[in-house]
Amino acid sequence: MKIKYDHETDAIYVIISNDKIVDSEETSKDVIVDYNSKDEVVAIEILNVKNSEHTIDLPFVLKSA
């Protein structure tokens, strides 16, 4: 898992897997979840990090490898 912050876009990217993204869903304001072909979460993008408070209900359970 990787976590990156982009100063230019004020966004945090949580990369869970390198699988190809085939679908995305905005689960709450400024929170986008990306899915692979098996409907598994592969990444989470949080926008406008500095300008607002975010509560994130993750739609999945992380499993240890």
Residue ranges and their predicted role:
Residues 1-65:
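Small, basic N-terminal interaction modules of short regulatory proteins
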